[in-house]
């Protein structure tokens, strides 16, 4: 077999990768996990379980819901509908087709159901199966996720944001002393299920314990304990220990000595050993717990106490008369002086009492005696009355209600997570399958609550990430599915009961519309299903990794306090402490940290390296916030020697509660994987983040998401090394699916012959159609450019094409520009930015924005609307851009007001003139009465038409334009098919040739003779089809040729079939909305050059607006004549404390000067002044070890590498592990510059040096999506508000402004009465005055009369609404 690697002539694509000088010291052991896997895993793996065989599906997601809802039985148990399996059909349209046709990308869900019908014998009640029907039922279209983790809903790309909510389980709190005036802590507990009723337990100020269900009226806790079946005795025995007082004649009582119950106090009586009679301590002496332990250790077991000590104690069992066995006092009663006399009189020798001491209070005993309910029935009825007030309480209803509340699987679900949390908090060992409350749970919740009150244990921290979990896409949609299926279940039962069950099939019972509407509603209207932020690739990734505390079942903005929004120690490595919105959502919407992932229970995990005996291993362990609390964790920058041993006497470690301790190396359990794991993706792209103030870093990471993709992309010279990962995972770039060799490349597509051979040995072909000038959700431009050349060898997952805002496989949100920090004539006051004309001239910050305009031709009452060029009363000039159908040409330059698509709408019949009557009589036809309803370019838009799409309803004849577009698309598909076939044919026939050459012919076409030996020349004379006609002697070769032929035919047939399906889809017409005959979409691309008023920003939160564009000759310049591009205000730094931008500027200055040095060396090498060794030496000095792979290559490749860095050397300074100030100075020295990073600068206007040295360097700046073109507008004539008759406000309403309050003061100050009157009446909201003034201007007169402004009438109406009848009476003077 031929090895395809024989013809790899060209270099591998990996040779083109950008190499950065990396300042990081910490070796990365773990790669950054795929940045969008949180979405894909949750939906595809956990919810849909796509591509998994039915038998291997786990009971989770869709499978678990279907299992829990089915089987469904009717009321009489005759019919039973069971679930067998489910599967998905292939979607009708692919992602691209759905985007273009405004459809949802979804796959039909087919569920196999089995309907069993039973026969029930009325006499005996025995059941026999009467019949079984199994059928596949269509359950609606379920949205599928695209490969980038998004959904296409009605043609737009949407993202479902993950939600942070409180984990199910039990939580204990106190009120922090806020409720009671004394500041006493009132403890409470709350059981939060995944779904079901909430149970609250609470102490009141009198230390009585109550409970509430769903925040209704409170009841005594003992009512709940009785309701779960506990008697008084069981309650007391469960919560209290008992101690026995034994009578000692004439001395008192002997009781067991328990040192744990002793607190420090002065004795009121002697401490006497009951066994020996020795006095250990005299009355008035002090006893302490330590002393008590000492006595206990020395053998003190029982002590003697006085007779009256029993008074005030509580009985731990019924007190009975020893002779008659009569109950004298009930369990739990307090011993009084009278009762003690009875005990003495009856000579009762042993009395059992409850152990109640300073460490444990009598709360439950007191509650028991306050509660009037004495048995289970009374307790259940009491609960029933609270939950169902007004309904008569009987025991059956009460029992059923109570059972349904907490113990019914269908109505109450703690979820597996809730059960795990419950078990760990209450120290129980109940199976994880039990997801309802148990009696043990309730008993132990009360126990823990009482212990907390007694000072044992600590309350829970709600903001701890062990108590908050993430609900991702899969789980959110799972909950919607459950709602839909429960609704459907009701309709199935109704249909079962209504119809004749014997004749019914499963599909007759199931109404899929119920399910579909619930899912649709979620995707279209849920607060968590959001329009994807598609400004640039970073904003897409960030949106998919966002965690929101808002949404259904979450918090609301108004009620969220400071604690929820604050950074918590457990956020470390899980949630980014920097990236969150400014404003009212601060802290409620967060971003996942770079290395974080979500475990199967929904808790966020962070990776750590294991440390064994003080030695750091490469084993990476992911820990959740709960697990992390058990260990001591060191920082990533702890010093480690070559053998991996931690150095230093003590290591700084994090322990539970976010505290830091110093421990010895062998005590350390884990260390961080990398310092970058603390921050999110956006923050990890900011170099020198460690030198910036947190507030500015927050702005920096937020503004990177608003950067507009530029025409010319440029990766930052000073990066952090994460740029490549972001570009790859964002889906903006195109990745190779398999190893292969590039066969064809143009700007629209890449064809790669793969090297992964199939069973038959023939290659498959990957064709990548690139996106050209597509509109994103935010009207920015998506355009992909190939990075490969023909003959390149690519590996799987190599980046083969750049997308928007990417450059050579790295994210490139802005441009590197030469910046000087200096004041310039006040034009950089208040963060304004001064830019050179070169930036505009060379399109440095020019971006393309694409607007979409749509026109629909509908079928109206009066007849169909028509798309046509034939529009009444429109000049030929206005139609110049339209084709014969009335649709604009691609490439036409349009401005506001131009017609894009001509459309006419039928008008209602108007009375006809005699002339028209005559015409109709002569020509015998009705003159078509239509009005112009064409699509015009709206105000403020101009540009070039880049694409037109025409959609026609099925069955409506297509116009010429639609046919032309269709033909173009079919040609494109045919070319893809032909190219793929050509590559396969080339391979197959070259293989055939190798098999045939040298073989002897038995039979063949006319051109060959039998018995000849085949040569290459002989085969050249044959056509491809004749190869198959040759028969040779060797049977093995013939077998192989047969196999090749079969595989070749199969492949050809598959290709033809795929092509035919796609063509059929194109030709079949479209599913358009109700009443629409034709839809035309026109896309206009606009080039936005940089102009004053546009907002720009750096990566450190330094933002500003362009104030002026200055000619190059007036800008400051360097001594070598280089003109500075941008001048920034040095005062923007000190107070903002984002020093990172200065370090970036210095390192950027080193970058371009090192590049100049390399270029000089290359020139000298070409002129033969130096050898390649000197260049190698300099590169090693600059790059260190990173460069070894390049230096091993041939000389030409080293020189070609040097040319690539001729504009600037690329650095990577990872977050918290990057270049220090000394490293920057070293680089400046290596570049031959002053280590201060400052230079002499010359004023372009005067030609003189500035007085002081100026900081100059390369800085990375972004153009933000706040363009002045989209903000400024002017109004001439426009709409008025109905109530006030004043212009509307805002650009979207084409609004204006009226003369305001302060403007009135200005005219009043000048006493300009008539001007003021004019401004407030005819020029504002005096409607009649306006009309009259207009008339007089038309007539050429100059006089006008002012009336009453409408706002005055509004004021009078408002007075009247307050019952004040104000009238305006005009009296003549």
From Swiss-Prot:
Pfam family, one: RNA_pol_Rpb2_1
Keywords on record: DNA-directed RNA polymerase, Nucleotidyltransferase, Transcription, Transferase
Name of protein: DNA-directed RNA polymerase subunit beta
The keyword NAD belongs to this UniProt entry's keyword annotation: no
Free-text function comment from the UniProt entry: DNA-dependent RNA polymerase catalyzes the transcription of DNA into RNA using the four ribonucleoside triphosphates as substrates.
NCBIfam families: PRK00405.1, rpoB
GO molecular-function term, one example from the UniProt record: ribonucleoside binding
Organism: Rickettsia massiliae
């Amino acid at each position: 077999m031929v090895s395809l690697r024989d013809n790899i002539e060209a270099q591998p694509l990996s040779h083109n990768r950008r190499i950065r000088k990396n300042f990081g010291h910490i070796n990365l052991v773990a790669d950054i996990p795929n940045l969008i896997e949180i979405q894909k895993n949750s939906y595809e793996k956990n919810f849909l379980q796509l591509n998994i065989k039915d038998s291997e599906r786990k009971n989770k997601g869709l499978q678990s819901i279907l299992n829990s809802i089915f089987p469904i039985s009717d009321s009489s148990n005759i019919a039973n509908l069971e679930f067998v399996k489910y599967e998905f059909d292939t979607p009708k349209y692919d992602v691209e087709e759905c985007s273009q046709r405004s459809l949802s990308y979804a796959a039909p869900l087919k569920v196999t159901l089995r309907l069993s019908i039973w026969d029930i014998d009325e006499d005996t009640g025995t059941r026999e199966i009467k019949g079984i029907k199994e059928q596949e039922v269509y359950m609606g279209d379920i949205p599928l996720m695209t490969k980038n983790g998004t959904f296409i809903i009605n043609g737009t790309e949407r993202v479902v944001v993950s939600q942070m909510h409180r984990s199910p389980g039990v939580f204990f709190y106190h009120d922090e002393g806020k409720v009671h005036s004394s500041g006493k802590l009132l403890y409470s507990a709350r059981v939060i299920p995944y779904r079901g009723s909430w149970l609250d337990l609470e102490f009141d100020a009198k230390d009585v314990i109550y409970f509430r269900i769903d925040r209704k009226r409170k009841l005594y806790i003992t009512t709940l304990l009785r309701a779960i079946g506990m008697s008084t005795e069981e309650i007391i025995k469960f919560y209290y220990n008992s101690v026995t007082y034994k009578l000692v004649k004439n001395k008192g009582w002997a009781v067991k000595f328990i040192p744990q119950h002793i607190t420090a106090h002065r004795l009121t009586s002697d401490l006497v050993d009951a066994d020996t009679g020795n006095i250990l301590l005299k009355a008035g002496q002090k006893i302490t717990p330590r002393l008590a332990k000492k006595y206990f250790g020395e053998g003190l077991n029982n002590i003697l106490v006085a007779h009256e000590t029993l008074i005030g104690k509580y009985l731990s069992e019924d007190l009975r008369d020893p002779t008659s066995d009569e109950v004298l006092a009930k369990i739990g009663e307090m011993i009084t002086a009278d009762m003690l006399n009875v005990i003495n009189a009856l000579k009762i020798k042993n009395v059992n009492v409850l152990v109640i001491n300073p460490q444990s209070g009598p709360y439950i005993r007191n509650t028991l005696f306050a509660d009037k309910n004495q048995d289970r029935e009374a307790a259940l009825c009491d609960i029933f009355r609270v939950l169902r007030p007004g309904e008569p309480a009987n025991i059956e209803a009460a029992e059923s209600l109570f059972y349904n509340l907490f113990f019914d699987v269908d109505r109450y679900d703690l979820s597996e997570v809730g059960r795990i949390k419950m078990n760990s908090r209450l120290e129980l060992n109940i199976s994880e399958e039990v997801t309802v409350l148990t009696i043990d749970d309730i008993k132990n919740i009360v126990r823990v609550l009482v212990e907390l009150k007694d000072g044992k244990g600590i309350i829970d921290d709600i903001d701890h990430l062990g108590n908050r979990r993430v609900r991702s896409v899969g789980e959110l949609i799972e909950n919607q599915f459950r709602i839909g299926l429960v609704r459907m279940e009701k309709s199935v039962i109704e249909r079962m009961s209504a119809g004749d069950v014997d004749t019914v099939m499963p599909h007759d019972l199931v109404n899929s519309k119920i399910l579909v509407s619930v899912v649709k509603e979620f995707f279209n209207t849920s607060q968590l299903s959001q329009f994807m932020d598609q400004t640039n690739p970073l904003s897409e990734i960030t949106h998919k990794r966002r965690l929101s505390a808002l949404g259904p079942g979450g918090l609301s903005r108004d009620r969220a306090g400071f604690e929820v929004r604050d950074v918590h120690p457990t956020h470390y490595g899980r949630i980014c402490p920097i990236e969150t919105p400014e404003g009212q959502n601060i802290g409620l919407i967060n971003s996942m940290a770079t290395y974080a992932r979500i475990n199967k229970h929904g808790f966020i995990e962070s990776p750590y390296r294991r440390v064994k005996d003080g030695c750091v291993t490469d084993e990476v362990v992911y820990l959740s916030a709960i697990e992390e609390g058990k260990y001591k964790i060191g920082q990533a920058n702890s010093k480690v020697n070559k053998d991996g041993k931690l150095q230093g006497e003590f290591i700084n470690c994090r322990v539970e509660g976010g505290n830091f301790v110093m421990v010895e190396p062998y005590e350390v359990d884990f260390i961080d994987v990398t310092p970058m794991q603390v921050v999110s993706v956006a923050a990890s792209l900011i170099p020198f983040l460690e030198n910036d103030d947190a507030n500015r870093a927050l702005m920096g990471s937020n503004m990177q998401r608003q950067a507009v993709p530029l025409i010319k992309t440029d990766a930052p010279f000073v990066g952090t090394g994460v740029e490549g990962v972001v570009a790859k995972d964002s889906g903006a770039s195109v990745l190779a699916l398999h190893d292969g060799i590039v066969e064809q490349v143009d700007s629209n597509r890449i064809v790669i012959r793969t090297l992964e051979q199939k069973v038959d040995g023939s290659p498959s072909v990957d064709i990548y159609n690139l996106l050209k000038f597509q509109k994103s959700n935010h009207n920015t431009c998506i355009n992909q450019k190939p990075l490969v050349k023909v003959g390149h060898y690519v590996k799987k997952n190599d980046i083969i094409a750049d997308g928007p805002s990417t450059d050579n496989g790295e994210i490139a949100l802005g441009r590197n520009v030469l910046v000087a920090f200096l004041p310039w004539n006040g034009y950089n006051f208040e963060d304004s930015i001064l830019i050179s004309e070169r930036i505009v001239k060379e399109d440095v910050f020019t971006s393309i924005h694409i607007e979409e305009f749509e026109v629909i031709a509908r079928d109206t009452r009066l007849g169909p609307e028509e798309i046509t060029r034939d529009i009444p009363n429109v000049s030929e000039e206005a139609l110049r851009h339209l084709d014969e159908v009335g649709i604009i040409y691609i490439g036409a330059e349009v401005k506001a007001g131009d017609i894009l698509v001509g459309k006419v709408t039928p008008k209602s019949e108007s009375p006809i003139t005699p002339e028209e009557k005559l015409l109709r009589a002569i020509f015998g036809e009705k003159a078509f009465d239509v009005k112009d309803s064409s699509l015009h370019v709206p105000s403020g838009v101009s540009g070039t038409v880049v694409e037109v799409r025409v959609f026609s309803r099925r069955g409506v004849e297509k116009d010429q334009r639609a046919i032309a577009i269709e033909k173009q698309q079919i040609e494109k598909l045919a070319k893809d098919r032909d190219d793929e076939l050509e590559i396969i044919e080339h391979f197959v026939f070259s293989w055939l040739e190798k098999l045939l050459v040298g073989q002897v012919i038995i039979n063949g076409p006319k051109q060959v003779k039998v018995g000849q030996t085949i040569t290459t020349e002989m085969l050249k004379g044959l056509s491809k089809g004749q190869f198959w006609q040759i028969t040779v002697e060797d049977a093995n070769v013939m077998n192989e040729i047969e196999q090749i032929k079969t595989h070749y035919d199969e492949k050809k047939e598959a290709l033809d079939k795929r092509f035919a399906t796609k063509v059929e889809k194109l030709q079949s017409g479209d599913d358009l909305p109700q009443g629409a005959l034709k839809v035309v979409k026109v896309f206009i691309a606009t080039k936005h050059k940089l102009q004053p008023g546009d907002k720009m920003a750096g990566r450190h939160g330094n933002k500003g607006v362009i104030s002026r564009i200055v000619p190059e000759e007036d800008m400051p310049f360097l001594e070598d004549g280089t003109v500075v591009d941008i001048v920034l205000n040095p005062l923007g730094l000190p107070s903002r404390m984002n020093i990172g931008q200065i370090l970036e500027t210095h390192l950027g200055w080193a970058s371009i000067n090192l590049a100049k040095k390399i270029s000089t060396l290359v020139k000298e090498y070409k002129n033969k002044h130096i050898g390649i060794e000197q260049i190698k030496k300099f590169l090693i000095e600059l790059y260190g070890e990173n460069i070894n792979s390049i230096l091993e290559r041939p000389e030409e490749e080293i020189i070609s590498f040097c040319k690539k860095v001729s504009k600037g050397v690329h650095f990577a300074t990872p977050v918290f592990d990057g270049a220090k100030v000394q490293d920057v100075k070293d680089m400046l020295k290596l570049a031959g510059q002053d280590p201060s990073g400052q230079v002499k600068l010359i004023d372009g206007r005067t030609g003189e040096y500035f007085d002081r040295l100026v900081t100059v360097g390369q800085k990375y700046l972004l153009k933000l999506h706040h363009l002045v073109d989209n903000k400024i507008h002017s109004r001439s004539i426009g709409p008025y508000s109905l109530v006030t008759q004043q212009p509307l406000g805002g650009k979207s309403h084409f609004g204006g402004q009226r003369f305001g309050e302060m403007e009135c003061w200005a005219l009043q100050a000048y006493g300009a009465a008539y001007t003021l009157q004019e401004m407030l009446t005819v020029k504002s909201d005096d409607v009649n005055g306006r009309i009259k003034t207009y008339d007089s201007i038309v007539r050429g007169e100059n006089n006008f009369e002012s009336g009453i402004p409408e706002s005055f009438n509004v004021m009078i109406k408002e007075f009247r609404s307050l019952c004040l009848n104000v009238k305006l009476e005009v009296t003549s003077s």
